[in-house]
């Protein structure tokens, strides 16, 4: 299990860190060293995900300044039996204030990662986007085009999840207005070897203000997605709800 402490100060005030633990049948034992954020204020480990065998880890630091203030980045680490070593270079945000690394996901084998930049302006101000990368043994290479949010202030990439083989991803945009202001939506995409193509229609929030898509999870085979609308009023004001789609 990997546990993030985004306000840990070992690498600087609020640099953040990650610890990984393994169960030996009786006790949880830390594996390797603390994985510290690059610098003060990075909030490293705000997002993280781990490969199927637990040997590869992707970690987001959405307020890292590597490509401009709050451009954000993600880093991938591999465990060699003793130490967590970074794989490849930082996956930096495209521009200042992108908040890249707000969300991350990794496939089962650990050779494909998705990184969400919820405040990217590629298609419109704060529309957000997701980028997917493959590991070739030396370098992380982008797979397909940016998956951009639909409209201004959608914050697409707020949440994301990836199937086991890495060929399907679900992306949440909780401030999308498709069914009313901030109703939110989720889109699911499939990789065809060249492009990321949307599967089916947008999965819209039920009502205005639901912020559906702030939380989501995709099944390992990519055929079922669970979506949280944490401000839905079905059970009372802001009681929240979850819906599952196939």
Predicted features and spans:
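Conserved beta-strand/short-helix segments
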Residues: 1-246
């Amino acid at each position: 299990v990997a546990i993030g402490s985004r306000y840990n100060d070992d690498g600087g005030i609020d640099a953040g860190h990650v610890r990984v633990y393994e169960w030996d049948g009786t006790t949880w034992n830390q594996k390797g060293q603390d994985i510290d954020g690059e610098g003060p204020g990075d909030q490293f480990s705000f997002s993280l995900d781990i490969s199927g065998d637990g040997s590869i880890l992707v970690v987001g630091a959405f307020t890292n300044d590597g490509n401009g203030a709050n451009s954000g980045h993600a880093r991938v680490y591999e465990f060699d039996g003793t130490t967590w070593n970074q794989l490849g270079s930082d996956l930096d945000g495209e521009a200042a204030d992108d908040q890249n690394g707000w969300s991350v996901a990794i496939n089962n084998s650990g050779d494909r990662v998705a990184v969400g930049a919820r405040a990217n302006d590629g298609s419109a101000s704060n529309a957000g986007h997701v980028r997917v990368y493959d590991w070739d043994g030396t370098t992380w290479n982008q797979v397909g085009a940016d998956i951009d949010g639909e409209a201004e202030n959608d914050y697409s990439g707020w949440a994301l999840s990836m199937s086991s083989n890495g060929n399907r991803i679900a992306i949440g945009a909780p401030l999308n207005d498709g069914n009313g202001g901030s109703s939110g939506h989720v889109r699911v995409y499939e990789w065809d070897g060249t492009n990321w193509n949307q599967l089916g229609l947008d999965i819209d929030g039920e009502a205005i203000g639901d912020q559906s898509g702030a939380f989501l999870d995709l099944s390992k085979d990519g055929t079922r997605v669970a979506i949280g609308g944490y401000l839905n009023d079905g059970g009372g004001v802001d009681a929240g709800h979850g819906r599952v789609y196939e």
